Amino acid sequence: MPPKDGKSAKKKGGISKAEKERLQREEEEKRQREAEEARLIAEREENERLERERIEQEKQHILELKDRERREDELNELRHILDENHFAVTVWEAECREKSKWERYMLCDGSPDPSVQPEINTYISLWRDDSENQIQKVLEECALTLELEKELEFLLGDGPEPSIAEQYQETLLSLQNLIHYKLNQATEELLKFANYNSDIDTGNMQTVVKDSNITLCLWANLNKNPRFKGYKFEEVGLGFELPKPLAVIEVAVRILHTRYDHLSHHSEREQLQKRRSMMEAILTQNTESSAAVHNGKMEGERDESESSKQVDECHSVRSESRKRSAVSVISAKEGRKSSSIKLLEEGESQMEEITTTLEADQHDPYPSPAEPVTDTDVHIVDLQQFTPLGGVFYFDLFHMPPQSRTVKGWEMRELLDTGLQVFPYPTEQSRIQSSTSVKLDEHSNTTVASLPVGVTVALPHSVLFLEDPQVARWDPIGQHWRTDCISETSYDAELRTISFQMTAFYAFTLLQETYANMPFQSWELRPLGQDSALFTITGALIEVSITVKGKQCMLHTEETKDLDRLLGKWMSPSELQKAMRKAGINIFVNEYSDKYVSINLKDPLIEHAVYEQMALMSSAVAFSWSRWNAQCRQEHLVLQACEQLEVGPVAEKAWSLYLLGAQRNQHLKMKEQEDSFSPELAEGSEFHSTFLHMLRQDLSTEGQARVRQSHHLYIDTVQRLLCATRVLTYS
């Protein structure tokens, strides 16, 4: 085949310029078409998004209008329900008080009525002058006196008039002092006859006398053996160790364990007085500053006075209706456009102002804590941070009273009117040497003050220590529990005993952190039937469950050891709280708690309103903790809820999330397990002004019937537990 010419070869070897331009044009046109298509798609998607948003906004607007239209009716209905329940509970409480007074009046057991001043004064005088000092008789009388104290504490809990309350407090203090006085007399009586009751093996006298309230361990040093180191009262798990100088002196050692605590309230009163002094100083400074502002005609005077007036008005409203619900305060004058409704409509600033005012009221169901006084002495125990448990151990050293001697068939005893005398310890070595025939090392400069005394204590069986207990001694001068002068502390968890040394003989107690079981890890309130529910809190250390049935509560916990007196017993909410705190199982908070526990700060008005409505629905609706609650700001709460009519655990898929606020409550589309939070409404759901109506719209007929038939005392009991634990803030 003949070869092609050069032109053909050139064409074959490359693309012509015209061809390149054509291809480029085609490529450019393709890019433009694709870009146009992408633009059109993006524009269409954007239009669709805007349309969806418009539709959503329209739906949102319609729902908001609908919510606004029925807002007044919903708030009024809720207020009416709460007021009815509150009135019924108030009437029942008044009837109970009257019934209790009548039963006390008709009681003919010979015991005085502690509320009647002449009766109780006569009782105190007669017992003080009674010469019967036998220990068993004294313990019996102490038991009666302790019952009278409980009556007085109950009366004080009713909030009597200030003058009456002061009278009750004085009577209470007199009874407490009288008990200790008579126990000292009984101790002296036992020591007078120590030589008759001496132990053959040791040559000393040791005895244990106890009842349900008091354990008295007494040891008298009759043998004065210099090799004596200490003694343990095995039957009660109490023991002591003495330094050698005391082993050769005629002294007596007493360990008096009272299962009640008559000392801590003195420290609480002292701390309260300091707080009041501090507040008075602050108020004085504020007054002086206000006066300076007034005299100087400073700008903003009118605004400040109006703000002060606003706060005073809010405080007045709260004081007059502190037992009513927060929602009642908000909605009581809805139709007259009151400041309570403006609180909901004018945003965060006013809510914070009201909250600040409410925090100052320490008698609220769960006010935010006031600033606790910080003492410069680090050894003083803060009784808000620590709780004395197991009662008080009085560890005392006494002079031995004169013992009887037999002379020519006659028993002779020196009678002294000094009573039981405390042996001063520590004291100078020379003083001890002068009172004994045993000489110590003359070259030693050691004083008895450097020789500590040892104590061993078995932990009380009625108390659950969640952590290793701490020890504090009582300072009678400063009226405080202190942690100094205590050393060599050793705790045996297996034997449940604690040993330590003190520089002197002090009353002491065992301490536990008040909020050791906080913050809560989770919680759940689940119905068990009509007017019955199970409230479970998983704390930082243990899980606690409380069964509610009517107006009664019963505690359950995994830790059952040594809590037989508490577990499985029905009692009122207030009795349960007191018993649980006394047993070391504290899940309750007060006005100082947030100073010691990491919390999710929430608006107290909103929080309290939610607790009220949860209590109303608790016969038919289960509630639970949500991790999203911590992610929301303080004006919003998030929790899980669902209808639960059967007894048993709630199915995981049954739970729904709810976002709650001061003005609006909504059912969320998202579930607890999702990775991110979304406020999108659940399909078919609407906004509601109250949580009650939000839940009620989805309830079955049976569920709604249960809610309507809920007894006011049951509702009050559940509400008290929720307000006392504040699970929405402390978990």
Swiss-Prot record:
GO terms for cellular component: axoneme. InterPro entries: CASC1_C, IC97/Casc1_N, IC97/Dnai7-like. Residues 1-50, 285-320 are annotated as: Disordered. It comes from the Eukaryota. One of its GO terms (molecular function) is microtubule binding. Keywords: Cell projection, Cytoplasm. Residues 17-50, 296-320 have a biased composition (Basic and acidic residues). It is found in: Cell projection, Cilium; Cytoplasm. Via its association with the multisubunit axonemal dynein complex, may be potentially involved in the regulation of cilia function. Part of the multisubunit axonemal dynein complex formed at least of two heavy chains and a number of intermediate and light chains. Belongs to the DNAI7 family. This is Dynein axonemal intermediate chain 7. It comes from Danio rerio. The lineage of its organism: Eukaryota, Metazoa, Chordata, Craniata, Vertebrata.
